[in-house]
Amino acid sequence: MLLLRWPTFCCLWVFGLGQLEQTELSVTRETDESAQISCIVSLPYFSNTAIHWYRQKAKKFEYLIYVSTNYNQRPLGGKNKKIEASKDFQTSTSTLKINYLKKEDEATYYCAVWI
């Protein structure tokens, strides 16, 4: 079983302009399954905001992917089949999907907004 963790409140340092919330504390899945992590974004301009996803393993942060206004994901490092991101404009939520889970996917995952 693989354990994916993330904090309840995520990294948005905008001095009261908004909030990011990841409501689940952990997700456990079997190897080769998929896992989804959601991030609720409380910003007045969600539709125009790029949501960025990171993971932390052994005190090292890794940038994974971002999703912008037009639902297009912008992966780095050729991970577009392994890692996907999407936005739901009705619920102001971004979702990270990790496919084909492996032991090395165990990490703490973060969503972020650059202001």
UniProtKB/Swiss-Prot annotation:
Residue span of the signal peptide, if any?
Answer: 1-18
Stretches for region V segment:
19-115
One biological process term in Gene Ontology? adaptive immune response
For whether the record's keyword set contains Signal, the answer is yes
**What is this protein's name?**
T-cell receptor gamma chain V region V108B
Q: Which UniProt keywords apply?
A: Adaptive immunity, Immunity, Immunoglobulin domain, Receptor, Signal, T cell receptor
**Highest taxon in the source lineage:** Eukaryota
Looking at the keywords, is Signal present?
A: yes
- A Pfam short name: V-set
* Native source organism of the sequence: Mus musculus (Mouse)
Q: Which GO terms describe its cellular component?
A: T cell receptor complex
